[in-house]
Amino acid sequence: MKHSKLLICFSLLAGILFLIVCCMYAHPLKKSTVIPDFSLADDTISASSDTPKQLSLFASGACLMDVESGRILYGKEEQTPRPMASTTKIMTCLLALEQSSPSEEVSFSSRAVSMPKVHLGASKGSSFTMNDLLHSLMLESHNDTAVAVAEHVGGSVEGFADKMNQKAAELGLNATHFVTPNGLDADGHQSTPADMCRLASYACQNKDFLKIIQTPSKTISDKKGHSYSLTNHDAFLTSYSGALGIKTGFTGKAGYCFVGAAKRENLTLTSCVLASGWPPDKSRKWVDTKALMDYGFTHFKKQKISFQDFSKTPLRVADGIENQVFLRVPEPITLPLASFETLEIHYLLPASVTAPVSTSDPVGTIECRINGSVYNSYPVYPSASVDKITFSHILYEVIDEFLSLFCKK
C-alpha cells in the first residue's frame, strides 16, 4: 500500500513537471491564432521635375532653413564656422528678454561706454529701461548697449558669455561659441550659417523679439531726460514681401552678414549669409538673402506625411505571457518638399520581438529619406507591455488548467 501511494505521488509529480516543461516550450496552454511575420511595404513620393541650378551667392557661407521642421533647404558651407559680427546680438537680445523684465533699469559702466562705434554714446552712469536698450541693440546695433545689457544680465561680459554659450548648447548650436555680446571680432567668437538659422528659428517664436526687430523707429530717453533717436537699418524688412526682419552685421574680419526671416502662407523660412562681401559692397547681403528666400518660396511647399496604419496588425511576441502585441503609429509629420525631391519612407520593423516588451522602449523605427539621404527617423512603440514568461506564471497556469479540468468532471 505504501509503495502504491508513493507511486501515485511520483506519477502526479512527474505529470506536473511534464506539463510545466511543455508549457515552457509551447506557451500558452490555451489555443491561439498563428501570428504571421510583421512586414510593411515602403512608401515613395517621386520627384516630378528636374533639380534647379545651384544659386550663385556672394557669401562665403549661407543657409536656408524651414522654421517648423528645422530642415535645411539650401546650404553653402553651412557647417563651416566663421565670425558672425553683430548677428551675435540676436542671442544677446533673446537672453535679456528671457532673464530680465522690460522695466528694469540698466546702467552704463566705464567698460560699456568705451566700446567703439556703432554706439549709443551714453555717458558713464546713464540709466535706461531694458526695453529701450533692446531697441537700441537691435535697431541701431549699438555696441555699448550690448555691453551694458550683458553686464546687467550676466554680472559681467564674461558671465554673460557663459550664459550665451549655455543657451547655445540648449538649442543644439554645437559649432557656435560666444566671447562678446556685441559680435566685435575676438578669437574663438564664431558660428555657422546653419546654427544662426537655428537661432533665428528659435527667435521667431518670441513675440517680444519680433516686436522689437519690426519697430521702424523709436525715441528713447535716459533717467535724466536725454533723448536718443533710433532708426531700424534692416532694409530687408521693408523690401521683401513677407519679411519678418532680424539682424545685420559687419566687422573687418566677418564681412557683411545678415540673418533673416520671412513668412508666406504656411511656410516660414530663416536665412543666413556670412562674409557676403566687404566695403564697398554693402548691398550684396541683401542680394544673397533675396536669392535664398526666393529659392525657398518658389520651390518648396508644406506637405503632411502620414504613415501606414499598422495599429491593428499584431506583432508576434516570443517568450511572453501574451503571444502578440499591437504597435502605436507615430503622428503625421509636416515637411517642406520640393517638386524635384523624392521622399521615401522605410518601415524598419522586426518580424517579431522577444519579451519583455515595454511601452517606453521602441521596437522599430520609421526612416524618412529625401533624395536617398536619411532626413530623420521616428521610433515605433508597442501599445501595451508584455511580461516575460516565468516559472511562477507557468505553475499558476498549470494549476488553473488542472482546476478547470477537475471542475468539468
Label the predicted regions.
Residues 174, 185-190, 194-195, 200-409:
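Domain-terminus/edge residues, biased toward the C-terminal soluble/receptor-binding domains
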Residues 2-3, 11, 165-168:
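Periplasmic/cell-envelope proteins involved in peptidoglycan metabolism and beta-lactam response
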Residues 3-6, 130, 391, 395:
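Structural motif marking the loop-to-transmembrane transition
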Residues 5-27:
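Sec-dependent N-terminal signal peptides of Gram-positive bacterial secreted proteins and lipoproteins
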Residues 22-40, 327-341:
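Short, compositionally biased leader-like segments
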Residues 26-207, 222-223:
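Active-site-adjacent loops and short helices of periplasmic peptidoglycan-processing enzymes
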